[in-house]
Structures are given as C-alpha cells and as structure tokens.
C-alpha cells in the first residue's frame, strides 16, 4: 500500500510536497535481527494470502468477494490482522485496482471481473506487531499482448529496483533503475505515490521514489526495511483521484500496472520479505 506525495490526506506521508530528498535518517527505524524475524514471518504469511487468491481470481468474481476471501483467510486461517482495515479510515482489507485504476481501488459488490481485464491486489498483514505489504497483478482470463507487456515490464522494473538494494547504495539508485526500465519500454512512471518504510507502522521513513538519479538521496543501511512498488502507466503519467476520496485513475484512461514487495537491507545486499513461492 503506497504512500502519497503532495497531499496530507489518506495515505500521505509526513511531507506535503514532492521532493527528491527523503526524510532524515532519524525518521528511519533500523530493525534488529529479532524484529526482522517478525517481519519475515508476516511476509511469509502474506505470501500465503496471494497463493490462496491465485485460483480464486477469475472472470465473474467481484472485487468485494476478493476482499472477503482474503480477510477470512488472514483472520481465520493465519490468525493475523488485515492491517489496511481501519487505517486512515479505510473500511476494507485490501485494495483492488482494475485496468486504468492506478491505486487505492475500493472493493465493490457490483464490480465484476471481466475477461481481458488486469487487476492489482494490494494487501497488508500484521502479526506479532509488525506489518508486511505486497501487491500482485492478475490477468483475468486471456489478456491482450499489450496488457501482458505492461504487466511484465512493471514486474521487471520492480526487480530492477530491488536489485539495487545493498548497504551504501542510495534511494536514487532504486528510483533510477525503475524509471530507466519503464521508460525504455515506452511507458511512464507515476510520481504522486511512492514506496515507504514499514515496520510496526504501515508508513515509516524513508520515502522510496520510483524515479531518481544514481548516487542521489539517502544511503541504505542494514536493517532498513521499505517497500518498492512502482506504478507504471501505458500512456501518460498523469493521475486523478476520484470523488470517493480513494480511487486513483490515469487521466488518459490508459492501463496501469503495479507490483510491490517489502524489502530489507542486509549486510550482503537485500532480502525480499514478501517473496512468493513462484518467485523462489
């Protein structure tokens, strides 16, 4: 679940204007090995939620049914808590963003998934006092080659960013890698929303932009944990928030895709705490 720049509302971070300068190091909470163990456990549980949804998400299912199934699985099977529910007044357990919805899509009882659509499912889970955050794209039935290329390019851009993570690298290295990969494919990077530090709170420092310059911004240190979650548009990068105060769409109604993982900086490089079985 991403952190919003510009606005103090909803998912906003502590900063009211977009900047290439992340929060100072004092706002970043370095996790101990014991805390990382708890976050790793939360991430493993979250991966199980997506595994449960993999065979459930298909044409004819409503986005509210996705919400209800995930919530039941988190609470009843995993004995954990859907961390998004109640956060900033959000009433549901996850976000469902279909086609030209960039992020923060609200589950609806009358939103039926149709053949050829794409959907991002964004879930947070808390157990043991620590939160994990991840999102995954699903193609509904057979999707177009154009939609598949966008989804795959966005996934690759996520990993280009993750692969930059190591002690001494900078946040700008991550943003540059994501941006360069997406723009080389002819796509645009959404700039109003970003990744964020995470731990006992859903949104901690630093802000992790998906654009940037190599060598710029905060240097990474072991024990930092944050999300990388690029939102990539097929058309122009402009977005617009809908009247419901949550849903964000592309201004030109082009398709948008997004993938997310929670990543820890280790002494050797990085660890993806929310890695799913098919990614191992």
Model-flagged regions — what are they?
Residues 3-11, 15, 19-280:
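Active-site neighborhoods and metal-handling regions in enzymes and metal-associated proteins
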């Amino acid at each position: 679940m991403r952190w919003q720049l510009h606005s103090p509302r909803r998912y906003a971070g502590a900063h009211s204007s977009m900047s290439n300068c992340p929060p100072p190091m004092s706002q970043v909470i370095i996790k101990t090995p014991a805390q990382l163990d708890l976050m790793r456990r939360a991430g493993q549980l979250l991966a199980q939620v997506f595994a449960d949804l993999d065979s459930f998400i298909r044409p004819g299912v409503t986005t509210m049914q996705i919400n209800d199934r995930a919530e039941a699985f988190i609470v009843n099977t995993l004995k954990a808590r859907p961390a998004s529910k109640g956060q900033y007044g959000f009433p549901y357990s996850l976000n469902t963003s279909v086609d030209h919805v960039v992020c923060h899509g609200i589950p609806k009882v009358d939103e039926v998934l149709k053949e050829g659509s794409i959907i991002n499912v964004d879930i947070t889970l808390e157990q043991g006092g620590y939160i994990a955050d991840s999102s995954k794209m699903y193609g509904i039935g057979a999707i177009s080659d154009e939609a598949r290329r966008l989804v795959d390019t966005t996934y690759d851009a996520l990993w280009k960013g993750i692969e930059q993570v190591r002690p001494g690298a900078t946040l700008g290295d991550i943003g540059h890698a994501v941006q360069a990969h997406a723009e080389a494919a002819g796509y645009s990077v959404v700039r109003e929303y970003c990744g964020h530090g995470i731990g006992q709170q859903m949104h901690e420092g630093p802000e992790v932009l998906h654009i940037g310059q190599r060598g710029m911004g905060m240097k990474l240190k072991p024990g930092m944990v944050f999300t990388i979650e690029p939102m990539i548009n097929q058309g122009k990068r402009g977005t617009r928030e809908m009247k419901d105060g949550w849903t964000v769409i592309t201004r030109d109604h082009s398709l948008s895709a997004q993938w997310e993982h929670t990543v820890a900086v280790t002494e050797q490089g990085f660890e993806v705490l929310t890695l799913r079985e098919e990614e191992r």
